[in-house]
Amino acid sequence: PRPQVTPLGDIPDAPAADSNFSQPWTYTDERQLFGVVRGEYDVTDNVMVWAALGARNGEEDNVLANPSANADGTTTAYRFDNTREDDVISADLGVRADFTTGGLEHRLILSGASTQLESKNAYAFSSFAGFANDLYRPTAVTMPDADFFIGGVLSDPLKTEEATTSSIALADMITMLDGRLITTLGVRQQWIETKSFDYNS
């Protein structure tokens, strides 16, 4: 992949569009799989319930060397490897009821939602001293060893993050004055729980 460049001071002139200054040993590989199912059911003419369930599985594997560039186009870069695996499950359910009190039409909605994430990660850096190159005259360098700063095992990343969000909401959409005025009143409570884990244990 053509990498992102970080300027070190003044921004250098853009290299030729047909020039690829990335290293031949860099790559990025990502796969995302999504799925969702949703259903609704009319209990009566005025009451409807719904439920939805979704899931995502993501896998990412990268070997990168994004350069930092001086104004004259000279660069330094170091190798960065990472793997990531995400599993996400989300759910949403609720009930909606329409009714009238006096001259007011109500649409009352009660809903709940929850999302759970589990993430596995590992990384490895080569020496931050890096290697020199040039945006305008790039040359291939030998791939440095990514053994300077390591977190986890790239071939078998461990769980590093858990996150759970959940919420419940109640809303009443009130229609009055023959539909000329609509007011919505609502309350919502949300809970968030996050946990972080050591990359190596």
Residue ranges and their predicted role:
Residues 24-25, 47-50, 106:
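Tryptophan-centered motif/residue detector
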Residues 32-39, 43-98, 163-199:
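Surface-exposed extracellular loop regions of Gram-negative outer-membrane beta-barrel proteins
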Residues 1-42, 55-86, 131-156:
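Acidic/polar loop-and-plug regions of large Gram-negative outer-membrane beta-barrel proteins
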Residues 59, 105, 109-201:
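Signature of Gram-negative outer-membrane beta-barrel scaffolds
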Residues 5-15, 88-94, 98, 105-111, ...:
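Solvent-exposed loop/turn elements at secondary-structure boundaries
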